[in-house]
A protein has these predicted regions:
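Residue-level hotspots within pore-lining transmembrane alpha-helices
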Residues: 24, 28, 32, 61-65, ...
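Helix-terminus/linker motif at the lipid-water interface of multi-pass membrane proteins
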Residues: 27-49, 118-125, 181-192, 252-283, ...
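Short alpha-helical transmembrane segments in multi-pass integral membrane proteins
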Residues: 1-22, 76-141, 189-245, 303-374, ...
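Hydrophobic transmembrane alpha-helices of multi-pass small-molecule transporters
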Residues: 60-63, 175-179, 209-213, 286-290, ...
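Short runs within selected transmembrane alpha-helices of multi-pass transporters and secretion channels
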Residues: 69, 138-156, 164-172, 197-212, ...
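Transmembrane helical elements of multi-pass membrane transporters/channels
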Residues: 17-33, 137, 148, 171, ...
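N-terminal transmembrane alpha-helices
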Residues: 7-38, 42-43, 59-71, 75, ...
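Small-residue-rich hydrophobic transmembrane alpha-helices
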Residues: 48-108, 145-164, 275-343, 379-398
Length: 463
């Protein structure tokens, strides 16, 4: 470990410069979810449970956005290592056409059949009626979010990681203000409840897109070739499909798996309380993981650029070892801090703030302790799968490692304990986390094999 961590000051300074803005961007994004949850929770447990259930299909949209964003990032980071700006424009063009088409299809489905989709998420029909207006609107926000996320990924891949932080910081302030006005009907605006939360999100996503468009027209770091972007060509389409479609499938089915975990909680005997607790604790857990997501994204940029520059296998393996150990140590520190805060903040601050009491409060504590304890495992798997393996073009293995533990272990085990055996919530929450225990050792084995290193910019058969 100590040998792997022996790097000069310039290396760690560069890592921090990449990681910090991405971590802050994720913190802002997840804080937005927490603010939404906080405001909706003031309406009552039923409203919060309804939005949680509505966000199950929405999470699939988020996964599609992240999949396209991550997939195009694989190509752009390696093209950036070669300083091939025209190919970067082509990659952005392909991702934009395909990404918007996918997001639009899902948004239309959510708009046309919101109640029917909500009925699949929970066995409480009154929650479906509460969540349907939210679902009708929220899907279209991700059409705009798709375009802005692709541009943020491009900026991040060319080492301008602060762009996303600034963009999402702006949109979070706008979203929070519009939430307050539209959810509660302040300053002459109508009181729209959960539908107001969706409209506020849509408006903030439109604002993100407008800012990205203005920046794209003025950027000097990656001056876009608009002709190449509008007509990216068949070769780039094939390359994008080869290296990015597995990532998209990965994120789509991983998002579906996470959504099914929420569906399972929504069909337990204590579904309303479980959904309310999960809404709060899921957001808190993600807040503690923002640094890990930042390190994972920084790993992808550094590894992808190193491959594009033509660094040797020995240099790439040394880089991956260093980044892996850094992520693990950060995960351990975060887990210790998070667990220490449970007895200090939950009872006096978190529970009153989100109006959790009785069974909901007990379930929230259970989900928090198990989730926080597993942070080091999540940290390493994030760095390995979304960072090293994806940036190395090892998309088949990164997809298999992300999906197999979830679908073959976590989902069946959670369904068995939660729906069939009605087991204690402690065991159900541990089952939700089970995938990370299996994923980590297999990731370690794959990276040590050195078979993950591929130059995705080379012609077919030369990678």
């Amino acid at each position: 470990m100590f040998q792997a961590l022996k790097r000069d000051k310039a290396f760690y300074s560069y890592l921090v410069r990449l990681t910090a803005p991405i971590a802050l961007q994720n913190l802002i994004t997840f804080s937005l979810g927490l603010i939404d949850t906080l405001m909706v929770s003031q309406l009552g447990n039923n409203e919060m449970a309804a939005v949680t259930a509505a966000n199950v299909p929405v999470f699939l949209l988020i996964s599609i956005v992240f999949g396209v964003q991550s997939g195009v990032g694989i190509l752009i980071s390696q093209y950036w290592g070669k300083r091939d700006l025209k190919s970067i424009s082509r990659a952005i063009g392909v991702a934009s056409f395909l990404g918007v088409a996918l997001a639009l299809v899902v948004a239309v489905v959510l708009f046309l059949w919101p109640v029917q989709i909500m009925d699949l998420m929970s066995n409480k029909h009154h929650l479906s009626l509460l969540g349907a207006p939210y679902l009708r609107v929220i899907g279209f926000s991700y059409v705009f979010n798709m375009l802005s996320s692709i541009y943020v990924s491009a900026q991040r891949s060319v080492e301008n990681s602060s762009f996303g932080m600034k963009l999402f910081g702006m949109s979070t302030v706008l979203n929070t203000g519009m939430n307050y006005l539209l959810i509660f009907g302040k300053c002459g605006f109508p009181m729209l409840g959960v539908e107001g939360a969706a409209i506020a999100t849509l408006l903030s996503r439109v604002a993100e897109f407008v800012v990205c468009l203005i920046c794209a027209l003025r950027s000097r770091v990656i001056p876009l070739d608009w002709k190449a972007l509008a007509r990216p060509g068949g070769e780039m389409l094939r390359r994008f499909v080869k290296y990015s479609s597995p990532v998209l499938v990965n994120e789509l089915f991983w998002g579906l798996g996470n959504s099914l975990l929420t569906v399972i909680l929504g069909h337990t005997v204590i579904s309303v309380e479980f959904l309310a607790a999960n809404a709060v604790m899921g957001n808190l857990n993600r807040l503690f993981l923002v640094v890990c997501f930042g390190l994972g994204a920084a790993t992808a940029v550094m590894v992808g650029k190193a491959i594009g520059e033509g660094q040797s296998r020995e240099e790439l393996m040394a880089l991956s070892r260093t980044l892996s150990w850094v992520t693990i140590l950060v995960g351990v520190v975060l887990a210790v801090v998070a667990l220490a805060l449970v007895p200090l903040l939950f009872q006096p601050v978190i529970f009153p703030l989100f109006k959790l009491e009785g069974l909901s409060a007990h379930l929230a504590t259970t989900l928090a302790v198990t989730g926080f304890a597993c942070i080091p495992f999540h940290a390493y798997s994030i760095s390995a799968v979304t960072g090293t393996l994806r940036a190395g073009g090892d998309v088949f293995w990164s997809t298999a490692l992300d999906l197999a533990p979830q679908w073959l272990i976590a989902l069946p085990l959670t369904a068995l304990l939660g729906l069939v055996l009605n087991a204690d919530p402690w065991f159900v929450s541990l089952a939700i986390q089970a995938e990370s225990f299996v994923k980590c050792p297999i990731c370690l084995w794959r990276i040590r094999s050195e078979k993950w290193i591929h130059d995705v910019t080379l012609p077919e058969g030369q990678s």
